[in-house]
Regions:
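Short glycine-rich His-centered loop
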Residues: 44-45
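Catalytic core of pol beta-like nucleotidyltransferases
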Residues: 1-31, 35-40, 50-97
Length: 97
């Protein structure tokens, strides 16, 4: 199934809301399927940087909050958590928002 395009200005607005609420910086969009814990076809996968104070609960909260704002499932991968091939590949393939 093809994922419909999302309005980039609305996406940026919602990302700014999440970044103001949680200690996280969204770098951009990853190709669908990059986040292993989100399986829905219409999900959006993001690469993010961890800011001081972010814990697992905050990361989960950011995912849920952004998902609620966008009306579709969201997965967030932290750049600091990448290892091996993904640590090299994801920063190169991320699409800025």
């Amino acid at each position: 199934m093809n994922v419909p395009d999302i309005n980039r200005s609305i996406l940026r607005m919602h990302i700014a809301t999440i970044e103001a609420k949680y200690p996280i910086k969204i770098i951009g969009l990853l190709p669908r399927g990059s986040v292993g814990h989100v399986f829905e076809d219409n999900a959006l996968d993001f690469l993010a940087e961890k800011r001081p104070g972010l814990d697992l609960l905050g990361l989960a909260g950011a995912e849920v909050s952004l998902s609620d704002l966008l009306g579709r499932p969201v997965g967030i991968v932290l750049k600091s958590g990448l290892k091996g091939r993904e640590a090299e590949e994801f920063p190169r393939i991320v699409e800025p928002v």
